[in-house]
């Protein structure tokens, strides 16, 4: 068992570089494909939020401003991706994740979609073996916390939160939080590839946190 398809939602550029480096390290471990996804705000979603009492012209102006800002942000994210791919010349650029696995070695791709970020990211994550999410505390990327929440609770897939700075090593020492629940069992099953290759694994448990189920 291995993680062959990784998803990295790039919400902005503040924590994007560290997230890209972390995700690439994971992809190298598993010879996986890394798919970078940026979700643009759909200007049409702004109209219902505009509130009553606004004229049609004001709503159109608001939608135009949203579209412009969304486009500029998408451009910055794409530039970040292109710079990163250029620095790592050994990567193979793929047109999409569906054909990437036919290419040997680590591959990488980029896609932009429009919609509600938390919905798109959670839904797309279900198509991948694991999601790598940028650190949510970067000031520029306020929406990254929404993406993280969506992936954690709505994707059903394992999630790796990238640190503020790319680590020198990853996955060598693993901690398991166990309380006997079905959720903890599912988390352990999803983490088995990491557990098999880890140098050390520690199980954390607490009588106060224990639920009905097997003990650690």
Segments from the language model and where they lie:
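Residues at secondary-structure transition points
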Residues: 14, 68, 72, 115-119, ...
């Amino acid at each position: 068992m291995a993680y062959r398809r990784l998803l990295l939602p790039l919400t902005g550029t503040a924590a994007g570089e560290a997230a890209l480096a972390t995700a690439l390290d994971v992809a190298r471990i598993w010879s996986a494909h890394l798919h970078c996804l940026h979700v643009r705000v759909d200007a049409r979603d702004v109209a219902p939020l505009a509130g009553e009492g606004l004229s049609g012209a004001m709503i159109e102006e608001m939608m135009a401003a949203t579209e412009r800002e969304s486009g500029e942000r998408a451009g910055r994210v794409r530039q970040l991706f292109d710079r990163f791919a250029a620095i790592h010349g050994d990567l193979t650029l793929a047109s999409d994740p569906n054909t990437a696995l036919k290419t040997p070695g680590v591959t990488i791709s980029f896609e932009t979609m429009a919609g509600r970020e938390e919905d798109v990211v959670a839904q797309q994550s279900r198509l991948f073996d694991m999601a790598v999410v940028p650190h949510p505390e970067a000031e520029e990327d306020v929406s990254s916390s929404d993406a993280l929440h969506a992936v954690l609770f709505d994707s059903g897939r394992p999630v790796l939160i990238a640190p503020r700075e790319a680590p020198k090593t990853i996955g060598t020492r693993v901690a398991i939080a166990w309380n006997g629940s079905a959720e903890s069992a599912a988390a352990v099953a999803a983490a088995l590839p990491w557990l098999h290759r880890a140098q050390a694994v520690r199980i954390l448990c607490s009588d106060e946190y224990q639920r009905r189920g097997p003990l650690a």
